[in-house]
Amino acid sequence: MTIKILNTFILILAKLLIGLNFSFANDIKLPPIVVGEKNAPIVIKEYFSLTCSHCASFHKNTYPKVKKELIDAGKVKFEFIDYPLDRLAMFAASIARSIPSESYVETTSLLLSNQKKWAYSKDPVTELLKLSKLFGITEKKFNEILNNKELMEKILKKMEEENSRFNISSTPTFVINDKHVISGALKYNEFVKKLKDFELLN
């Protein structure tokens, strides 16, 4: 997806969302979702979409080792940034952002690992509801979230801000120390090689 197409997509997605019958929420906050040592020398931001198969692949095959070898070792601080690339992904991101932030990583991990069951089903919203119930979300709350204009607007605003800074053109994209940008579901060895190429790891 090119940058121009992505910018157009963001505008179209915003119009689609605004066209829904929304009920407004009050004083919604989107706290950063970060794992790892506060003062870790390497800060990695991941931009991901919950309906993106490449994102699901990264979180299944690469992230566990990144967590074990880099994050838990104090070398990396890792931030998760919602970057939904379609309406269904926006719904899923809104679900993840509507539970306590300390459960966000567990929730998105479950959504990504079960992506084929809900995102590519004949009735994805119903399947998303089934998964949401595992997080303690009732059907009533689920419907409220899917009609929460303010929450979705804040997610969109964050997307626009990050895209203007780093020209995010696909998911997953990783920004390292606000300087280096890499894209794709890299294998762990490829991921580490990039960090070494940037002279961030020995």
Predicted features along the sequence, with ranges:
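Bacterial N-terminal signal peptides
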Residues: 10-21
